[in-house]
């Protein structure tokens, strides 16, 4: 039973994007780990955790509200 935890910056994913991620990731795990057995779908757990931009940093760069707006527009 896989548990997939996605961590992302708050505001990057809308409801439709999250639904698409859930579907595609589940499909991938059914295909690979479940060996194509559709019943395996019931055992795939996925969680999306969103964190405010100020809780992220890459090197010395933290995302700003303007950066997020550019990425989502």
Language model features by range: what are they?
Residues 2-73:
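A domain-level signal for the structural core that forms small-molecule/cofactor-binding pockets
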């Amino acid at each position: 039973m896989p548990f997939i935890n996605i961590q992302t910056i708050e505001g990057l994913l809308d409801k439709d994007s999250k639904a698409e991620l859930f579907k595609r990731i589940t499909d991938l795990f059914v295909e690979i780990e479940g060996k194509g057995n559709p019943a395996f779908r019931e055992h795939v757990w996925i969680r999306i955790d969103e964190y405010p931009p100020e809780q992220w940093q890459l090197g010395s760069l933290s995302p700003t509200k303007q950066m997020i707006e550019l990425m989502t527009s």
